[in-house]
Amino acid sequence: MACTALTKGRGLDCNRISGGVKFIYFSVYDDFARTDWAYSSGTEGEIDTINFQTSTIYRYTVPRGSTTANETLTGSTENGTLFYNPVVNMVLNRLTKEDQNQIKLLGQTQVRIFAQLNATHSATGNDVIICLGMHNGMSMNAGTADSGAAFGDRNGYTLNFDGLEAQ
């Protein structure tokens, strides 16, 4: 059985794009079901409708140039498998008891993470927002609270979230 579903090539895009993350949004994983989002016909992988009526979204503003969102693809030729490992490394400046309490709650909760990038969709001009953990959720599995040493050092948190997705 041949698996030749490749449909097109890709040229070079314009060279005026920006990296980085502007905002991180969290939603509790259990608060909305698979039926709450939809793809338009022919746009698998690009969600155009999400019903957040039963879910609250929490927005975190992150310092410029500090937060990353990425996915690592892992495949096995021997097993015929491919899966994705989404990871978000998020920085929050300043140690506070309020943040410490929220971080504790984030660590106890499986979440979906939406990362608003410093990029815009070339056809529409809309901000690019990617979702990580859409099907299986994300968990905070590491982090640090760092006071810094010198006056100019960062005082704050680094939080690491990861997940595992089949697509």
Predicted regions and their residues:
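Extracellular/virion structural assembly segments
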Residues: 3, 64-140, 149-154, 165-167
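N-terminal export/ancillary region detector
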Residues: 1-10
